Structure formats: structure tokens, C-alpha cells
């Protein structure tokens, strides 16, 4: 080490001994070498340019114009390639300061303008950061033809315009906040020059047409976004550029903050409308939720066939829009007819029974029903659900419709869901009302309630406009004194009229929702039904009635699980409405109740559904992190306690893992009462967990509290404290649950956000407490509904064997959501294995059967995807999925009130492509179906699908797939081949020989 340091010092000394005289010649030599390296042609060019600059310095003004023109020609002729700095710009760089001083001396405006034109291009290579000389001299020049300088120069100008505009905005903001209150004049000063907003905008509007003309649609949109003038874009767009411009704008929407996202959608809508692309325009109008815009699209054409095509697009969204001549299509009057045609063409008309998907004969273990203690009535109920989902919409089955005795193989409320499954089999077909009519005259209230619910399901989304049979049949039962009957009728109305904004339903159910004298169950059910009917409308009357319930209900009523559905109803009302929810959130925050924070999270998440807002997701993740930071000692104590607890659990492993599994906590408590040391450890663990701010619940805590109360003298005071703690605990539990669901809702909008959310869910599953872990699987299911990705359902499979049975049940249900309507073979196998694994645990087996039913929804012809190919969010579908997810915050509650699972029926739709001719008759056309490819911003005309298979309509279209016509024999009325598509013969088509 010493030797090395000595050597370094020696070299430093040697270098320091070299005199400056010896160093400078080296630099001069380098310069000489560079000059020598210039070719003869380059040297001549450099000399000529320097001569031209010298002429500009002379007093003879007659030479100025010719010299400037020569300079311009020289620069333009050399800028054919931008792989390196053009040589004239390189050679002129040292003269830039001289040319700037010449500009300041001259007085002739024409010559100054011409010189500013040259200086603007030179400033690209010389100008320092923050000076924006290129833009400054461009604005000082009157030369309008600046396009000849090339694409790179125009892009440089656009960059400086954006920077200057941002400086102006910041300056305006500073002026507004300044204490002297002086107002800004809308300009920004840079090196003594004032950039005015008007001049900058005028130049910007000169640049935009250049970008559009030279395949720079993205640059044009970005520039107008920078200067907040995106509404000025439509005037520059023509039939050659509008498609690429609008595709780029719509793709940008999930990445933009409000109100820019809405401005982009409205601008794209106006462009599509002006170019007569009506099907694209109506998709954006639905996305914006503006009925006036939808009407404008219909009014833009008088073609009745186009009106029908637009009506079919609206029908899939279950909107409340009314238009004369196509009302039966908008009301889904032909949906059942088209679906049965699909079933016939695909040879699916034969009914299936649940055993066809259970495949119990493949299970090597003992028969499910022979297992000790298994409730066969509950498994018959599960079969009713599976049968209803499996044969949904087919109007026939082998289990229930012709077998009146099947209903009585279930018990109590199970009969309600069993009868209601008939409505599921006849969904979208009013013939189901006749099948259910006979059950209305039965004495058992559960059976009658099932018939009422079934009527609502069979009429789901189908509206005649004049006569509403479901409303006529159900309206007399909503005020029935029997809660079972009234709740079923209310729920049936909610399913039947989801998304319809029907005023008659509002008038019927609002008094029930607003009444605080009725049981909270009835009021919550009425509020939920109204929210589904008026999803995403911000209806003031319903909002007021829900808020009244929060304010006027007793503390005991607000402890029930039904409160969650009141909060959910408020969220569904404001779904996708963004900032419009702010007033409601302010009102909620004024309520002094532990539930307040949880309600805010749920309502806020619903309002910003699909926005992909990163800041909101960060806020939710912050809520999910433990609030209190413990010292090292506490952490050490907790680790010790956990270690001891785990060792005891291991010691008692056999008893903990008894088949019932559901009562692990109880068994642990019993064992620890015997073992004094274990009891101390348990108490210690409880204390440290409370310090950490984590919520605790379950049989263990209740038993400990009972011991405390019996030994305590002041039981009354303790009781009050316990109640307050329970309320706070319930509020925290719900807040955590809603925050997890909120991440899924917000991330739905774009693919990158979905990928990131899945990573977050993995972390939450590892580090979250029990309440967070219970909701993570459901959130994963919502993010990938009807999209069975291997990485998602493999993760869910791991969670389905969790020690916490509630985590397992939610994971299994999420697997059903993930594969809803896909018939995915891998998922089907995993669910069959889970059915065998949980053959002795009846609740988990029930959920597994439900998941199997969802997987085989409509024999694989249905979907619950919340987006269509045009990226339009289906609010009715999302609201129906969210209802079951919120119910599963407490799986035991949903198992008791299983009829709420039928809310899913409101969001189910066929995933077919059905081709019709001008007359509305089905025709067979060859289409290519393949994986959708993102073509936004790509050059040329890239293929929109890859790995396609050619099929004849009708065909099924899964998540992430797209279709296109194979030949030009037919012309489509819609740009997206999805759902019902109307085609017309192409008069110019000739068959290839």
C-alpha cells in the first residue's frame, strides 16, 4: 500500500513539473489537426459560411438579403439527414453570438425577420436550457413558411412551446398567490423577451397541421395537450388522419388526470361524429354517460338500419335511452331469440345437469353425500344454483322446471333460491313468468319469495317500454309484512331493472328506502335495488334517503352487516362519476361514527372506478399499512410471543386440523385454558397486536372478554367501552376490506395498472392482517373477471388452501369469477380437486359448487367481463360483481343470505358475434377470431389481431379476443365486430376465381 501511494505522488509531481508553455501547444496542435481533417469540400463550405456572416457585419445593406438567402439555402440543402448535426449548423455555431448582436443592431423589419428565421434554426444547436431562443426568434420572424426547415426543427419548436407554456402557468399561479395581489398579463419573460399566450397559441396552431400531414398525429395531440387546447383539434383533422388521432386520444384517457380525460373523450367524440363514424361516437357517448350525446349520434343519420345497429350497441350496456323505432332492440326484446339461435347453431340446446360438471365419478374418495355430518339440503341448494347458472337462458333443464318436488329437497331460505333458479333458466325470456306463476300460490313464504325473485331474474334487462310485466307482478309484494317476501320482491325489481333508471321503480321503492321505521334489512335492500336501477346517475333523492338511514338509525342497527349494503348503494349511485362525489364525501365525513371512514373509502373508490388514478391507489395502500410504529422492544416481545404460540399450535396440530376447520380459534382457546403458560402467551400476543393497531375478532376474543367481564366489578362501564371498541373495530375491518376492493376498482381501467395491482395484492397477502387477506382474493377476481390468466388462478389456488377458512372460501369464489363463462379446463380440474378436498366442510363445498357453476356459465357462452372491445365500462355488470364481493366481506353472512348471489345475473351477457342482414335475419359469414393486438401509434396499417382462426357466425368471443370479416363480401355497419353486427352486401365485391 505504501509503495502504491508513493508511485501516485511521484506521477502527480511529474505532471506538475510540466510548464504551461508546454501544455498550450498541445491544444493548438489538436485544433490544427481538426482543421486538417476537414475535407476540401467541408473547408470550402466553412469558408463560404464565414464569408456570408462577415458580409452581414459590413455596413453595405445591399448585401444583407442575398447573404441571408444564401445562408438559408446552405442550411436547407444539408439537412436531408438528421443522424448527426448538419455541417452548416456546426460551422455557424461559433458565429451565433455575433449574429444575435447583428439582429439587435438592425432596424429594417424585413431583414430582421429574415435573420430571426435563421437564428431560430441555429438556436437548436446553441441555445442554453431555459432560454427558448429557437421559439423566441420564431415568434420575432414574420416568415410564415417555416415548414421547409424540416421535421426535427418543428419538433424542437413544439418542445419549447410546451416548456414556455408551463412556465407561464407557473408564473400565473405564483402571481395569484403573491401577497401584493398583482394580476398577470398572460405572458412569461425569458431573457428580457415576453412570450405571450396568444402568439404561442397561434404558432402552435400552425404546427399542428404540419404534424398531421407528416404522420405525426401523436405529436399533434401531445402539443395541444401541453397548451390545454385539445378542443381546437377537430378543425385540422380529415378523413385520412381522424382514425389514428382518435385511437391515440382514447388510449391516452386512462393516463390523464381529470378534467383532461373528459376533454379528450369529448374531442374524440366530436371528431368521430363529424367523420360519420357513428358506432365509435356512440361508444364514447356511453362512456361519458351523456344522453344528449347519444341522441346526437342517432339524429346524425336517418338510416333505419344504422339506428338498429346503434340500438344493439346500447342494448349491451342496459342503458335507459329511448328512441322511437328501435325501442324493442334497446330494451333487449330480441336477446333471448338471438341467444337461442346461437345455442341451436352450436348444438348446445340439450340441457345439462350439475353432475356433468361435478364429475363425481372421477373422484376416488368417498361420495360427497356419504360424508358424516354433511347437510344434503345445502348441497341440493348448491345444485340449484349450479343448474341455474349452467342452463342460464336456455329455457330448459332436467332438474327443476318439470320437477316440483326438487324445491322441497332444500330447507328454509334454501327454497327461495331453489325456486329463483327457474328464473335464471328462463333469463331474458318472459315465458319464465308462466313457469313461476304456480309458485306464487303456495303457502310457504320462502317458496313465494323465490317465485318473486325468479320473476325479476327472468325479466333482467328486458324492457318493452309500455308494459313491464315484472313491475306489475312484483309491485304488490314490496310492502308485504313478511320480510322474506318483501325483500325478495325488492331484490327482484333491482335485478330486473338494473341500469334502466325507471321512475316507476323509484316511486315504488324510495319510500321504503327512506323509512327508518322499517327493519334495516328492508331499507338496505331497497337502497341497493334503487342503486342498481340508477347506477352511476348521482340521483339526489336516493342519496338523501341513504344518508338519512346513516344519521337516524340506532347504534345497534348500524352494527349489522346490512349497513355495508347501504354504503355500497351510495357507491354504486356515484360509480364512475369522479369529482361529482366530493359533496357526498364531505357530508359523510361530518357523521360521527366509526363507519364513516369505511364508507368514504368505498364511495370514493366507486366514483373513480376504472380511472387508474395512481394517487388514489397510493392513498388506499397507505390505509392498509399499520398506523402505529412500535419500538424494538415491542417487536422483540411480539416475535417471542408468536414463536411460543406457534410452538403450542404445532403441539396441538392434530386437534387444530380436525375436519371442521371452521372452529380453529375455539379449539385453541379451550386448550389454552388448560395450559396456564399458553394462556399468558395468548394474552401477551393480544396486547402486542393491539399496540400494532391491528383489528382482532373471532371466538377467542369473545371468550377472553367474557372472562374479563365476570371478574370485573364495574361491568356496566366495561360494557360501554367494549361496545365502542367493537364499533371502532368493525369500522376498521370494513375500511381495510373496502380499501383492498378499491385498488381493484381503480386499477381496472388500464393493463399496466392491473399488472401493478396484482403485485400489490401479493404483498398484501404476505404482510396484511386477517381482514385484508380475506379480501385480496376477491380483488384479484374482480381485476381478472372472465379472464382466466394462469398466474392469477394459480395464485388463487394456493390461497384456497389457506388456514383461514374465510380466505379459502373467498379464493374459491374468486376462481369462479376469474373463469366465469369460459369453461376453462384447468380451472375446472382445480375446482373438482377443491370439491374433493373440502368434501367434509359444507360451507367451503357450497362455495366451490357456486364457483363451478360460474365457470360453466351458460355452458360457456356467457361473460361477466366489465369492458367490451371498445373499452366501455359496463357499470351494471361491475355493480353486480361488487355487490357479491362486499357481501363476502363476511362469507358467513352471504351463506345465510345466499339469494344475494343472484345479483350476478344482472351483469351476465352472451359473448357472441351474431351477423344479421338489413332485414334483421341471421346470416352466416366467415370471420377471423384472434388475440387483439394494440395498434395505437404504430406506423402504417398493422394487423389488429394475431393467431386467428376462421369461423362461421355465430361465434363466441372471449376476453382479449377480437374479430374481423374474412372478405369484403359484406360491409359492417359497426367498426367493432362484437355482439349483434348488421352487415350489408358490398356492391363492388367480386369473388376470387
Swiss-Prot record:
Gene3D superfamilies: Leucine-rich Repeat Variant. Residues 1-44, 170-191, 628-728 are annotated as: Disordered. The keyword Zinc does not apply. The modification Phosphoserine is found at residues 16, 19, 178, 187, 695. The modification Phosphothreonine is found at residue 24. Residues 665-680 have a biased composition (Acidic residues). PC repeats lie at residues 417-449, 450-487, 488-522, 523-563, 566-598, 778-809, 810-844. It comes from the Eukaryota. InterPro entries: 26S_Psome_Rpn1 (IPR016643), ARM-like (IPR011989), ARM-type_fold (IPR016024), Proteasome/cyclosome_rpt (IPR002015), RPN1_C (IPR041433), RPN1_N (IPR040892). GO terms for molecular function: enzyme regulator activity; protein-macromolecule adaptor activity. Residues 1-11, 24-34, 681-720 have a biased composition (Basic and acidic residues). GO terms for biological process: proteasome-mediated ubiquitin-dependent protein catabolic process; regulation of protein catabolic process; ubiquitin-dependent protein catabolic process. Present with 306000 molecules/cell in log phase SD medium. Belongs to the proteasome subunit S2 family. PANTHER family: 26S PROTEASOME NON-ATPASE REGULATORY SUBUNIT, 26S PROTEASOME NON-ATPASE REGULATORY SUBUNIT 2. Acts as a regulatory subunit of the 26S proteasome which is involved in the ATP-dependent degradation of ubiquitinated proteins. This is 26S proteasome regulatory subunit RPN1. The gene is RPN1.
Amino acid at each position: 500500500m505504501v509503495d502504491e501511494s508513493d508511485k501516485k505522488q511521484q506521477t502527480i509531481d511529474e505532471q506538475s513539473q510540466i510548464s504551461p508553455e508546454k501544455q498550450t501547444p498541445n491544444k493548438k496542435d489538436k485544433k490544427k489537426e481538426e482543421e486538417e481533417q476537414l475535407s476540401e469540400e467541408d473547408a470550402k463550405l466553412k469558408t463560404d459560411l464565414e464569408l456570408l456572416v462577415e458580409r452581414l457585419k459590413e455596413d453595405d445593406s445591399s448585401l444583407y438579403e442575398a447573404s441571408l438567402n444564401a445562408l438559408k439555402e446552405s442550411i436547407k440543402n444539408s439537412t436531408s439527414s438528421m443522424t448527426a448535426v448538419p455541417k452548416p449548423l456546426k460551422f455557424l455555431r461559433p458565429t451565433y453570438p455575433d449574429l444575435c448582436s447583428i439582429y439587435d443592431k438592425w432596424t429594417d423589419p424585413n431583414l430582421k425577420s429574415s435573420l430571426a428565421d435563421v437564428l431560430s434554426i441555429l438556436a437548436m444547436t446553441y441555445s442554453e436550457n431555459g432560454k427558448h431562443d429557437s421559439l423566441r426568434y420564431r415568434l420575432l420572424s414574420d416568415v410564415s413558411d417555416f415548414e421547409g426547415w424540416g421535421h426535427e426543427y418543428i419538433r424542437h419548436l413544439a418542445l419549447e412551446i410546451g416548456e414556455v407554456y408551463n412556465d407561464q402557468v407557473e408564473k400565473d399561479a405564483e402571481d395569484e398567490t403573491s401577497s401584493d395581489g398583482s394580476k398577470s398579463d398572460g405572458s412569461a419573460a425569458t431573457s428580457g423577451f415576453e412570450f405571450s399566450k396568444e402568439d404561442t397559441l397561434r404558432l402552435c396552431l400552425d404546427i399542428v397541421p404540419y404534424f398531421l400531414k407528416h404522420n405525426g398525429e401523436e405529436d399533434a395531440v401531445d402539443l395541444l395537450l401541453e397548451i390545454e387546447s385539445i378542443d381546437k383539434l377537430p378543425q385540422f383533422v380529415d378523413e385520412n388522419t381522424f382514425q389514428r388521432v382518435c385511437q391515440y386520444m382514447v388510449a391516452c384517457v386512462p393516463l390523464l388526470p381529470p378534467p383532461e380525460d373528459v376533454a379528450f373523450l369529448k374531442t374524440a367524440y366530436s371528431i368521430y361524429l363529424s367523420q360519420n363514424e357513428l358506432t365509435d361516437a356512440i361508444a364514447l357517448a356511453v362512456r361519458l354517460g351523456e344522453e344528449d350525446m347519444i341522441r346526437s349520434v342517432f339524429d346524425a343519420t336517418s338510416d333505419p338500419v344504422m339506428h338498429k345497429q346503434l340500438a344493439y350497441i346500447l342494448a349491451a350496456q342496459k342503458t335507459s335511452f329511448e328512441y322511437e323505432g328501435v325501442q324493442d332492440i334497446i330494451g333487449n326484446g330480441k336477446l333471448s331469440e338471438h341467444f337461442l339461435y346461437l345455442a341451436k347453431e352450436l348444438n348446445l340446446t340439450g340441457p345439462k345437469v350439475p353432475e356433468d360438471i361435478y364429475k363425481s365419478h372421477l373422484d376416488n374418495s368417498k361420495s360427497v353425500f356419504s360424508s358424516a355430518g354433511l347437510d344434503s339440503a345445502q348441497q341440493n341448494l348448491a345444485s340449484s344454483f349450479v343448474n341455474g347458472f349452467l342452463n342460464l337462458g336456455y329455457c330448459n333443464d332436467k332438474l327443476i322446471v318439470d320437477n316440483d318436488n326438487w324445491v322441497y329437497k332444500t330447507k328454509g331460505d334454501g327454497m327461495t333460491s331453489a325456486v329463483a333458479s327457474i328464473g335464471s333458466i328462463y333469463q331474458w325470456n318472459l315465458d319464465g313468468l308462466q313457469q313461476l306463476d304456480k309458485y306464487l300460490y303456495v303457502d310457504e313464504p320462502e317458496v313465494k319469495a323465490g317465485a318473486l325473485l325468479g320473476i325479476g331474474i327472468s325479466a333482467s334487462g328486458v324492457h318493452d317500454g309500455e308494459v313491464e310485466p315484472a313491475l306489475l307482478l312484483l309491485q304488490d309484494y314490496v310492502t308485504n309484512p313478511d320480510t322474506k317476501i318483501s325483500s325478495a320482491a325488492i331484490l327482484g325489481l333491482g335485478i330486473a331493472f338494473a341500469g334502466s333508471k325507471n321512475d316507476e321503480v323509484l316511486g315504488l321503492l324510495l319510500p321504503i328506502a327512506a323509512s327508518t321505521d322499517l327493519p334495516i334489512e328492508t331499507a338496505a335492500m331497497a337502497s341497493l335495488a334503487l342503486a342498481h336501477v340508477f347506477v352511476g346517475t348521482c340521483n339526489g333523492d336516493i342519496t338523501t334517503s341513504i344518508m338519512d338511514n346513516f344519521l337516524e338509525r340506532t347504534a345497534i342497527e348500524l352494527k349489522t352487516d346490512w349497513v355495508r349494503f347501504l354504503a355500497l348503494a351510495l357507491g354504486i349511485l356515484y360509480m364512475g362519476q369522479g369529482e361529482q362525489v366530493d359533496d357526498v364525501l364531505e357530508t359523510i365525513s361530518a357523521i360521527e361514527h366509526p363507519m364513516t371512514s369505511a364508507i368514504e373509502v368505498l364511495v370514493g373508490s366507486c366514483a373513480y372506478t376504472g380511472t387508474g388514478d395512481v394517487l388514489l391507489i397510493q392513498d388506499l395502500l397507505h390505509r392498509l399499512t399499520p398506523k402505529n410504529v412500535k419500538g424494538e422492544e415491542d417487536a422483540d416481545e411480539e416475535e417471542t410471543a408468536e414463536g411460543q404460540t406457534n410452538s403450542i399450535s404445532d403441539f396441538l396440530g392434530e386437534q387444530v386440523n380436525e375436519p371442521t376447520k371452521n372452529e380453529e380459534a375455539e379449539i385453541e382457546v379451550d386448550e389454552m385454558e388448560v395450559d396456564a403458560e399458553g394462556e399468558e402467551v395468548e394474552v401477551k400476543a393480544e396486547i402486542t397486536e393491539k399496540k400494532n393497531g391491528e383489528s382482532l375478532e373471532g371466538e377467542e376474543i369473545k371468550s377472553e372478554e367474557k372472562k374479563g367481564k365476570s371478574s370485573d366489578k364495574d361491568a356496566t362501564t366495561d360494557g360501554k367501552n367494549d361496545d365502542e371498541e367493537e364499533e371502532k373495530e368493525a369500522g376498521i375491518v370494513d375500511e381495510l376490506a373496502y380499501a383492498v376492493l378499491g385498488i381493484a376498482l381503480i386499477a381496472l381501467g388500464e393493463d399496466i395498472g392491473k399488472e401493478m395491482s396484482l403485485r400489490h395484492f401479493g404483498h398484501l397477502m404476505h404482510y396484511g392482517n386477517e381482514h385484508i387477506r380475506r379480501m385480496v382474493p376477491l380483488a384479484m377476481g374482480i381485476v381478472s373477471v372472465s379472464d382466466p390468466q394462469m398466474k392469477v388462478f394459480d395464485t388463487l389456488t394456493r390461497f384456497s388452501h389457506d388456514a383461514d377458512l374465510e380466505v379459502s372460501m373467498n379464493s374459491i369464489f374468486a376462481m369462479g369469477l376469474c373463469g366465469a363463462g369460459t369453461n376453462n379446463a384447468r380451472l375446472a380440474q382445480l375446482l373438482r380437486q377443491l370439491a374433493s378436498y373440502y368434501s367434509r366442510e359444507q360451507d367451503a363445498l357450497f362455495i366451490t359448487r357456486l364457483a363451478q357453476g360460474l365457470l360453466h356459465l351458460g355452458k360457456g357462452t356467457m361473460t361477466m367481463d366489465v369492458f367490451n372491445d371498445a373499452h366501455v365500462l359496463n357499470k351494471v355488470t361491475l355493480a353486480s360483481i361488487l355487490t357479491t364481493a362486499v357481501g363476502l366481506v363476511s362469507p358467513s353472512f352471504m351463506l345465510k343470505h345466499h339469494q344475494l348471489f343472484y345479483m350476478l345475473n344482472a351483469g351476465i351477457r352472451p359473448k357472441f358475434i351474431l351477423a344479421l342482414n338489413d332485414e334483421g335475419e341471421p346470416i352466416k359469414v366467415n370471420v377471423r377470431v384472434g388475440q387483439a393486438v394494440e395498434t395505437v401509434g404504430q406506423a402504417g396499417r398493422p394487423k389488429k389481431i394475431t393467431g386467428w382462426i376462421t369461423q362461421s357466425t355465430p361465434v363466441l368471443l372471449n376476453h382479449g379476443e377480437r374479430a374481423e370479416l374474412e372478405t369484403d363480401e359484406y360491409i359492417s355497419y359497426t367498426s367493432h365486430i362484437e355482439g349483434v353486427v348488421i352487415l350489408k352486401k358490398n356492391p363492388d365485391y367480386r369473388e376470387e376465381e
